């Protein structure tokens, strides 16, 4: 159930934010049930990385791909969701098998004292702000879905929602400006400058030509190379710069490989980048933020423990994603 909740939340928010919310909750649930909280948290991290693939806003890599290739919110939803659901089912089966002994240890129930503490922690401090934010969030999602019909890019819906919420909630503007993640914004600007420079000097063209010679006119081979190649690299390389570097290469292949004009290689890139992040603890932002939270508790996530679950899940889900893209396209 927690995996499903995490996957759905990651599709609507993003996996980084979802794990910030889910990790403390799962820690308390694990303690209440008398089991190792990591038996809940690690599957949630894996589900968050996969669940976000199904929408434009679910992962930073999808946002990059969507903006570069002109793929909209509905396109991701239609072409990726079924594959994501299949991957989550396979992942759930493996996780159930892996943690079967741990989950059998769960205690008989929650003590009244702990239950009261959980209730206190779950108490909503500002219900007005909650329902206002929920309403605006719903309107933004509607804008994502319907905006494509009037050729409105998703950024317009997001900015309109943010503006409306600022006016409605009237927060401290100075505090809001301080809260903006300027480091990430500057990182993205610098990243695209570097990718553009590499493209201008011809290095990306050389890489694209080499991959084109390997793939030839075989679309299935192209999907395989992209999804498994990017997925393997994403286990150790941050998937955002990797995706940004791969975009011009995928664009070249989409024009040279017969049948690739359906944008299937972009979807393969999306799946490979996100699913590959499950391989190692350093493979994704959600992994690292979750590890950082658990580091402050008695149940920190170790590199080895994450690897034992994450690496098999990575290649199982990559295989499911590969088969789905072949069926879909």
Kindly give the residue locations of the regions a language model identified.
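Membrane-interfacial helix-loop connectors
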Residues: 9-45, 60-79, 181, 196-299
